Amino acid sequence: MDISGRHEEAGEYLMVAAAVHATVGTARLQSVVGMGFATSRNEPTLERTTAVVAEATDELPNPPDGPIVAERGEFYEEPEWEVEQFLGHDFKYVESIAERETVQAAHHAAYAARKLLL
């Protein structure tokens, strides 16, 4: 998953979270199964950020059978267990090349969706 727009622009916020459900091998993303999106105009905090991510994950056509994966910076480098408590779903930070590629796909999706909404 990835979030675009956690910064203030012209006195407003527009966070767009993209969740990508993908099948991955050991070294690469194999296929995208589905995507989910959610938005928030609230000032970002850990609680609000995890809420928009949970909403995007709920929008996936099929629930993921593995953990939600993100870059460390998405959740202010908080420990995985703390992020997991807010999400209510298994969570971990990126560890493999395939996970990084999946997060990169989510980044492109979140960025593009945000640009469409502006």
PLM features: what roles do these ranges have?
Residues A27-A51:
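Acidic/glycine-enriched edge-of-secondary-structure segments
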Residues R6-V33:
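Acidic, metal-ligating active-site segments
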Residues S4, S40, E71-G73:
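Short strand-loop junctions, especially beta-strand C-caps/beta-turns
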Residues T23-T26, T49-L118:
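A two-mode feature
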Residues M1:
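Short hydrophobic beta-strand that contains or immediately precedes a catalytic carboxylate
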